[in-house]
Amino acid sequence: MATVSMRDMLQAGVHFGHQTRYWNPKMKPFIFGARNKVHIINLEKTVPMANAALAELTKISSRKGKILFVGTKRAASEAVKEYATGCDQFFVNHRWLGGMLTNWKTVRQSIKRLKDLEIQSQDGTFDKLTKKEALMRTRELAKLENSLGGIKDMGGLPDALFVIDADHEHIAIKEANNLGIPVFSIVDTNSDPDGVDFIIPGNDDAIRAIKLYLTAVAAAVREGRSQDLAVQAEESFVEAE
């Protein structure tokens, strides 16, 4: 079972929150105290909450659920793409476009345009265009790939969101709430935990901490997938008998 230990969290600096003056009082239950005007997160709370979230993510992916990883700030962007891709899931790692979930119909049209442009760039269509037109389409393709590349093969709304920074990604969380999509999120001491179904109190800035969360979530997803495959294999074996 995918889990994270207290030791892993301490080594990655998960317990370091933000400066005390930036705190959100709603995070008080998860704060151990303060050191040098920086809040210290209570890992006695974080460890079981993180492991409960991982168990639920395993369950969702064992039912073929789609997990959308969201981390658009610089510290998280590259890692979010790497780990989401590594477990065959989906991601938004640049700007969250308003309506990405709540206006899926429009987003789907943009994804279709992205895929059309990808085909045109490969089948020689671009070569037949004027230099100016080809350049315009190349730029449009790059822009669409940047914003929608991570969800172009999602084929519909996700079954869960895994978010790195609840404060930074509040629009994504609000959209998921409106649609009843469960939200799993790292929530630092400066963030509002409201709207997050599975709160993981922790540092959302340190790259080591971010990679620790992503490694664990990717492992949980892969574990869920392998359970699903094992069930499928068992069912086909029974049918064969």
Curated annotation (Swiss-Prot):
Give the record's GO biological process terms: translation
Q: Entry's CDD domains? A: RPS2 (cd01425)
InterPro entries for the chain: Ribosomal_uS2, Ribosomal_uS2_bac/mit/plastid, Ribosomal_uS2_CS, Ribosomal_uS2_flav_dom_sf
- Which one of the record's GO molecular function terms can you name? structural constituent of ribosome
The GO cellular component terms are: cytosolic small ribosomal subunit
Query: Which UniProt keyword terms apply here?
Result: Ribonucleoprotein, Ribosomal protein
- Domain of life from the UniProt record: Bacteria
Q: Which Pfam families match?
A: Ribosomal_S2
* Residues spanning the signal sequence: none
Q: Which HAMAP family does this entry report, sorted A to Z?
A: Ribosomal_uS2_B
Similarity field:
Belongs to the universal ribosomal protein uS2 family.
- Can you say what this protein is called? Small ribosomal subunit protein uS2
Source species: Serratia proteamaculans (strain 568)
